[in-house]
């Protein structure tokens, strides 16, 4: 493929691009809108039918200002005496909590793992947008390792439930946001930390 791109001045076009799996399909400009609509409908038909899903009510997450930063229910973000350093802490609850999909769905946005990662999102946005001078973020996950591993089991076993499925994808997006935040993140491990499973 590299040789083709290097040797062929016009690159790889049309049918050859489809044959080489570089694109899913090709379409003349005159049929573009119709083909996009057809492909979108076909992709939508392949998804599970969720017509009976009621959704959940999303509540605003309030934060408390502390002497050195901000605190939510499960996440704290402190700016500490060191210059350009922040301390990000995720605190696990004492137990995994509900494991039944129906009970979890009933909790909605109050399900602790969902709320924690929504709070993490707010902390990351604070760092990204409002704290440009911060260069180093010391990260801790505190709590029981069994809770960190247990919530992964719940997410995996309940993956067929629409809500748990959506929360799992939300967690992935937040972890990608964490990885792509232009700060240096260091995990601080020690007694009482719980870097395991999703939190590893």
Show which residues each predicted segment covers.
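Alpha-helix capping and helix-loop boundary segments enriched in small/acidic/polar residues
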Residues: 4, 8-9, 27, 31, ...
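Terminal presequence/propeptide segments associated with secretion/organelle targeting
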Residues: 92-94, 132-145
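A short, well-ordered alpha-helical element
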Residues: 108-134
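Glycine- and acidic
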Residues: 100-110, 148-158, 182-190
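Glycine- (often His-adjacent) and acidic-residue-rich active-site loop
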Residues: 140-171
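Amphipathic alpha-helical segments at domain termini/boundaries
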Residues: 1-108, 147-148, 197-200
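Glycine-rich beta-to-alpha active-site loop
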Residues: 5, 10-11, 142, 170-200
């Amino acid at each position: 493929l590299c040789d083709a791109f290097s040797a062929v001045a016009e690159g790889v076009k049309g049918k050859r691009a489809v044959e080489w799996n570089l694109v899913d399909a090709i379409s003349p400009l005159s049929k573009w809108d119709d083909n996009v609509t057809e492909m979108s409908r076909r992709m939508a038909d392949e998804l599970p039918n969720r017509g009976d899903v009621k959704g959940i009510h999303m509540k605003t997450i309030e934060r408390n200002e502390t002497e050195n930063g901000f605190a939510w229910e499960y996440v704290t973000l402190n700016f500490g005496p060191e210059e350009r350093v922040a301390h990000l802490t995720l605190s696990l609850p004492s137990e995994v909590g509900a494991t039944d999909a129906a009970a979890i769905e009933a909790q909605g946005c109050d399900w602790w793992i969902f709320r924690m990662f929504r709070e993490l999102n707010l902390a990351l946005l604070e760092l990204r947008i409002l704290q440009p001078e911060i260069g180093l973020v010391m990260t801790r996950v505190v709590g029981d390792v069994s809770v960190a591993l247990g919530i992964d089991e719940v997410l995996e076993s309940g993956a067929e439930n629409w809500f748990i499925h959506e929360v799992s994808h939300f967690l992935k997006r937040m972890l990608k946001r964490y990885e792509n935040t232009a700060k240096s993140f260091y995990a601080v491990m020690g007694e009482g930390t719980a870097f395991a499973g999703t939190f590893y």
